[in-house]
Amino acid sequence: MEAPRRLTLALCVACGLGLALTSARAAEDLTPVLSLTPGQVLRLAGPQLGLSTQYPWLVRTPPPGLLVSAPPGHLELTAREALPWRVVETNHGALLVRTRDGVPVKLAWQGEPGQAVSAAGNFNDWNGASHPLTEVAPGRYQLDLLAAPGELIYLLKVGERYLRDPANPDSIPNGFGSWNSRRVLQDEGGAPPRLRRLGWTRQGEGRVVSFLAEGLGADWSWAGLHGNQALAETAVSRAGDTLRVRLGAGPTLGPDRLRFAVSRGTRRSTLQTVFLDSAFVWQDAVVYALMPDRFRNGDPANDAPVRHPDLLGPANWQGGDLAGILACLDEGYFRRLGVNALWIYPLNESTDQAWQEYPEPHRWYTGYHGYWPVHPTRIEPRFGDSLLFRQVVDRAHAQDMRVLLDLVANHVHQEHPWVTEHPDWFGSLLLPDGRRNLRIWDEQRLTTWFEPYMPDIDYGAHPEAVDAMCEVALKWVDGYGLDGFRHDAVKHVPRELWEGLTRWMKAGVPDKPFYQIGETFGSDELIQSYVGPDALDAQFNFNLFHPAREVFLDSTRSFEELARILELNLANYGANSLMGNLMDSHDKARWPSLAEGDLPLSGANGQEIGWTKPPENDDPRTYDKTRLFLTWLLGLPGVPFLYYGDEIALAGAEDPDNRRMMRFGAQLSELERRQLELTAELVRVRRTRPELRRGDLEIVHAGHDVLVFLRSAEDEQGRPSRSLVALNKSGRPQRAELRLPLGLGSRTLELKPWEGRILPL
């Protein structure tokens, strides 16, 4: 067994890395888990590590196989080869390090000599230029790459055409009415070791945390941090398959949490995070997302729909407002549902006109959704005023609810004062080659415009624009007591803005767990690149959201496939990340309408169906299928988000049909009322079971139609707390014979058609 080595080497890191973390806030931040690609240098600045920038740094001698250097202002790490879990110690805190797993892949194309051929996919964020195929013989092209285990989704770009791989018959819908090629990549290195939690006991001022370890063998090692401090070499003992970790009193660096993992050779367990205090963390949240204009009309006096001959009702203002949200708070709607956080869509004053959408068929829309701001801090009069919003936040806080606000930072509407006051802050709509830089999502990721009337802010070239947006954000926080932000279009904004914003928030609100979650569609690597102590806390887990929807609703797809994706997701993000999980969103067709069969899973024609034949819930089984997916959602690690209407299985095709007015009380059918009650019960179970909020996840059964996983954690006294989440996606009764770990024995589960159950053990 190998424990971390502890010789000390002094490495000096220069000052001047920007605003240092305040000591109060720094004590709450965990250092990031670093993933290294063997042979490549990972260069990080002090704030990216969540460590103090005070001079000097003392870095202990790196573990075997890892090179560490400290050029001015940075830390550089290089893995010579695949590594087990490692710890890198500094005098300001310690870091957990691992290497990325990869599977060799060969892509080929047979065509004409002299063609421009490349590959684009989830491995390179759909960049059609970064991975060219080499012409190895006349007309024969080849690319060798190392891809992450799991699903490889890709297309071949030949000239200007994106084509499926003719050598690969496996394909998957792309969500826009077409198809991508797919390969499922298996890691052939053998099963990794597994850690299971056995609880903790008090010992003097400290604790002893116990784990059951399987598959260790003789060549095993461990890595662990208490808060942000490395464990002592003598902290871990082994008796058979039981590991005991002895901790002292709470750490002086970082929160009172144990992060612990084991390795067998270079095969690594998932990282376990044991929460040793019960103070609120965002893993405890169930967030309710609402679009003010489409939620509830509490004050008809401020209704002001736009008049335009070509503007249709679903694209116009509907009358929802802050008074409606306040009424729901006063009536106890959110409290009865059980949610403990609200995400309120943007409240900025919006344009008072209708504007034509660039893509065909060029429909007209208003800014009812909030994403066309014409002022940085003024509240849209149709929603209310600053006094009313302050009442909403205060009333939510009085009910022990936190409030997130949607912050629009990527762009503004052309009527925004910054457009005339600071025209140089905005990128050009025209590219050097003469094309309009509109919706070129990947090739022009950081500069593309969403619409010709929505100028894109060029933060990379204008640091003063970064400061201006950070000042705006702090005004919203200081003015209303916000608890966090949801950030729009994160991948289209340079990281400099998110770093600046996080510095401002940590300096401005150091004494509470301020949560920032972003929206990025792309690879796990791209998503993770915006997450860290110096940037966002989390992003939405779209790389689990999309395949889960498809597997649940496609009878030909197996839960075995989803189980592999889930395990890869856990390996990437950990079982105790703050990633946001969804059933629905304002950008996607609603789950009940997919379950009803009114919309194709491929996404083809989803928007037109919303305009020409809006779906409705005609089949009572749609409510069963919706409860099934909500059971999955509320049983997962991370932070669950309910999009308004999920609790009643509200129907809807794609935007704007997925943004219908919410309905309440007597407006609900009997099936909808029953759905509301059962959703509240699922939320209650989530809120009261620590393993669902703070626990690990182990898949104990994955068949074609039945998936069962075990969630395990500890209660406030350290005793094991466990639940099974069992799901049947078929229209037939199913039986699952389970052999449970941890001495929990065997049991037979009987599941009704489309049934999901959470079973405390």
Residue ranges with predicted function:
Residues 75-82, 146-150, 249-256:
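Surface-exposed, short loops/turns at beta-strand junctions within beta-sandwich domains
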Residues 27-57, 199-220:
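Solvent-exposed, low-complexity, repeat-rich "mucin-like" stalks and linkers
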Residues 33, 98-113, 172-200, 275-299:
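Low-complexity, Pro/Ser/Thr- and charge-rich linker/hinge segments at domain boundaries
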Residues 401, 472-474, 478-582, 632, ...:
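Active-site-proximal helices and loops of the catalytic beta/alpha 8
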Residues 281, 295-480, 500-510, 514, ...:
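Substrate-binding/active-site clefts of carbohydrate-active enzymes
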Residues 63, 97-151, 157-186, 226-227, ...:
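Aromatic-rich carbohydrate-binding modules that target alpha-glucans
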Residues 700-739:
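Carbohydrate-binding surface patches
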Residues 153, 747-761:
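C-terminal beta-strand-rich structural cap/linker in extracellular carbohydrate-active enzymes
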